[in-house]
């Protein structure tokens, strides 16, 4: 297309894929991030989001991938990174006259301690976020909704990708493997809860479509592979591909959820507020089904996954085998 783009969080797993995908499709991309050594080759902006607000870097499209993502932490840290940070990105996009801002949010905003199937984009209850990360993403989305009403600013598109996986994943799969190695993965409710995953290549595709499709402006989109599966079957497939034995513990979900609440309370008053071994959000995530309806993305963006869950798990296993000492631990 010949347009320019700036991608925040470009030193991260998703951000790096977005940079490479946009460049492969003709965009002149500036990769923005705090760690120069981790940024993709090509034009870069090294600095935090506060510095970006005043940066002299042209962009027709701004993609905001940067975020502090953790089930535990202080509200002030999440607020600065994810709410104030988003405001700084919006400020930058307005100042350089960007036509569109694509914001990568989180389907964590749908989280609840119960099964939720085929969730639509409007089915959000902002009154009861399960942790500070989710609260911060809700605030960031609210900020952008208000901004999208300003005809002088950039058009805003919000994406909510679920369970991003693929070769080089530094978060989702490595966390599971660490638990598996230490004690075995807990199977709550028998591991029957349905899990939606998304190949990182498919998220990058969705970002590009969100940047280009005229009818996407002012809209939020769920993004997944559209292939939900039971947690235990995904775990078995992953470990088999890695050549590891399936080690798990069958535990009563209600008991583990209660213990997690106690651990959160204790860690919350300890010096330094250390992260508890398990949180209620994590327990809820691996206990309950949460699947997303992606019909809006299909109908409006023309989104269709191009990489399957099986292919993503296989590519992770291949990268794992090629890495000294095991997995790509990020």
Provide a role label for each language-model segment.
Residues 5-25:
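N-terminal Rossmann NAD(P)H-binding glycine-rich loop of SDR-like oxidoreductase domains
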Residues 139, 170-175, 189-211, 218-222:
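Substrate-positioning beta->alpha
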Residues 166, 188-193, 221-228, 239-242, ...:
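Glycine-rich Rossmann NAD(P)(H)-binding loop
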């Amino acid at each position: 297309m010949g347009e320019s783009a700036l991608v925040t969080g470009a030193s991260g797993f998703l951000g790096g894929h977005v940079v490479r995908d946009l460049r492969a499709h003709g965009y002149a991309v500036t990769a923005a991030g705090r760690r120069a050594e981790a940024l993709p080759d090509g034009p870069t902006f090294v600095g935090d989001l506060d510095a970006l607000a005043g940066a002299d870097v042209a962009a027709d499209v701004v993609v905001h991938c940067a975020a502090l993502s953790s089930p535990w932490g202080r509200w002030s840290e999440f607020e600065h990174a994810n709410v104030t940070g988003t405001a700084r990105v919006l400020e930058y996009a307005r100042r350089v006259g960007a036509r569109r801002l694509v914001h990568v949010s989180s389907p964590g905003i749908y989280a609840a301690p119960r099964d939720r199937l085929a969730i639509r984009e409007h089915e959000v209850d902002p009154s009861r976020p399960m942790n500070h990360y989710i609260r911060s993403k809700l605030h960031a989305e609210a900020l952008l909704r208000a901004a999208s009403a300003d005809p002088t600013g950039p058009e805003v598109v919000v994406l909510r990708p679920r369970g991003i996986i693929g070769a080089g994943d530094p978060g989702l799969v490595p966390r599971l493997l660490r638990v598996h190695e230490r004690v075995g993965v807990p199977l709550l409710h028998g591991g029957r809860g349905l899990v939606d995953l998304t190949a990182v290549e498919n998220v990058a595709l969705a970002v590009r479509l969100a940047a280009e499709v005229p009818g996407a402006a002012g809209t939020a989109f769920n993004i997944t592979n559209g292939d939900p599966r039971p947690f235990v079957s995904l775990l078995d497939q992953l470990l088999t591909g890695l050549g590891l034995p399936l080690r798990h513990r069958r535990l009563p979900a209600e008991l583990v959820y209660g213990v997690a609440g106690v651990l959160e309370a204790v860690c919350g008053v300890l010096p330094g507020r250390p992260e508890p071994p398990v949180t209620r959000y994590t327990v809820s995530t691996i206990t309950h089904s949460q699947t997303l309806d992606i019909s809006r993305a299909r109908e409006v963006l023309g989104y269709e996954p191009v990489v399957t869950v099986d292919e993503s798990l296989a590519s992770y296993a291949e990268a794992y085998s090629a890495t000294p000492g095991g997995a790509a631990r990020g």
